[in-house]
UniProtKB/Swiss-Prot annotation:
Signal peptide: none annotated. The gene is ligA. InterPro entries: BRCT_dom, BRCT_dom_sf, DisA/LigA_HHH, DNA_ligase, DNA_ligase_AS, DNA_ligase_CS, DNAligase_adenylation, DNAligase_N. This is DNA ligase. Zn(2+) binds at residues 389, 392, 405, 411.
Amino acid sequence: MTDLEKMREKLQNQINYHNILYYQKSKPEISDAEYDELKKKLAAIEPEAYATQDSVGAPPDERFSKVEHQEPMLSLENAYDEQGVEKFLSKIKRFLIADEIEILCEPKIDGLSFSAIYEDGKFVKAATRGDGFVGEDVTHNVATIKGFPKFLQDVQGRLEVRGEIYISNSDFLKLNENNEFANPRNAAAGSLKQLNANITAKRPLRYFAYSLIGGIEKSQSEVLEKLEKLGFCVNEHRSLTSSLNGMLKFYNEIYDCRYNLDYDIDGIVYKVNDLVLQSRLGSTHKAPRSALAYKFSAIYAKTKLNKIFIQVGRTGVLTPVADLVPVNIGGVLVSRASLHNQDEIKRKDIREGDVVTIKRAGDVIPQIVKVDEGSRHTNMPEFVFPDICPECGSKVQIEGVAVRCPEEFNCKAQIVEKLKHFVSKDAFDIVGLGEKQIKFFYDLELIRQIPDIFILEERLKEFSLKEHHGWGEKSIANLLSAIQSRRVISLDRFIFSLGIRFIGQVVAELLANYYVSYDNWYNSMSSNDVELVGIDGIGEKVAESLKSFFSQERNIKMLNDLTAYLQILPVSSNSSDSFLNNKIIVFTGKLRAMSRGEAKVRAKVLGAKISSSLSTKTDYLIAGEDPGSKYKKAMELGVEILDEEQWNRLC
């Protein structure tokens, strides 16, 4: 084999490797610009071989059924500077022999491409991009996405909708409590590619639709308007222009405001607006000639990693954080970066003293993407993750990728974080009681557990707070007034405020809606009657976490002490006028649009009574896929049977 052939093979192997990391595993190790550079090098060595490559992604994941795309899901050509955009516009003008062409500009969402098929208005299939020609079947998972249309009114024949699935930055921060995911795209990919759709249903997936195949629209702008009318989520940021200046103006406007968006974008997509002209332009084997992705300049910088320190969170998870020599990235001074977990440190071989490349994306904490091993001194040791908690000295426990301190009642860091969570905006929202004040009161032994907050006024009668810097009569009065005003709270916020592991806002709301009152919830949990939670589809992790929490006598005492100072409002229901009020309902089979637990919660909120067995008193059987023997029995008993679509319309 010649040196040139060896180089070609090496480049091809590198490209294939990075294709799998990006498209299948959603764990890219290099930037888009570096990836494009590999492709350019291969093209320079053997243009013809490169031009005949078929793949535009990665092979489909073997765990999923395969779906062949009737029209390939091609990738887009990229540009990284204004010259690339100008070249694209000039090229299509020459091809079409036109002086002016209307271009639609849209943000490029940093998510996962999907395709959804509808037959006579009914949602029947969803697939990932895969290699562009064959994708993975993710129908049941896409069906769980909140607000995703399952039926389109007045649509006949086959219609295909394409778009991008993502997780918002705010949802990502809530979801990633245990630092399981590196970024929102990674979280979205992991959520969409679950073999169990019930897991996907609990993840905050969202989507934007941008393409319609099988419609009668004449332009891309009409396509977006049609998608909106059909009930799909469409990105509001878009602009029509016929000039290079207009294209660049939109790029600059979005570039400047991108950090105000609650989702990641990595550039702008330019599309020829006229669909007839798109068809005339056609495509190469990899990308349509009618579109271009103008990627944002990578927001990277190199700096030195001084030290890796460990933070202990509310649930005891130990998270490594990099302390950096401060560096300016995109106008922001960065001095810390997330290292996620010990597996991430090992995979990238990150060591204290390394020169590292930092990437800043959106509002997510900056990340280390690469180590400059050439700058590393020979005697720099590997980082050893601690086997004891740096805050309390307890032996840690390994749980998957997470390392946890088990001493939740004795570890100062965990107690302080729990107190911070309890008073946070989405929980009790006590103004004036932030991290600084909590640590201050903790060190003075005035607040050592949650109930102490509500007896702080009593304790301060025997303590001269005004002697301490920053505290005067007014600030003390304001704090005590803020605490007093938060003695009445809704059940869902109360459950969320406790900081129980895996109980976020969504699960807290599900529990509140199911149990309706605090007494119902407390009595059920403290009597170990959490089997119901598992049946409802809230999940094994949540059920086990609740069991663990209520098995601790100190938690039971804390709840009893705390609730003595509070009024916890039951869930109000406007179910009296509901069609389902006082109706007895039984569920059977698999539901596609929501988990069984969510369906039962919705039914209870509407006033229905849920039963696990059929009888002549049953009003409705809600039948999903593979309903089993209950379906036959319902027919024998004369019970009215509703399919999932009918059920969705009711609730």
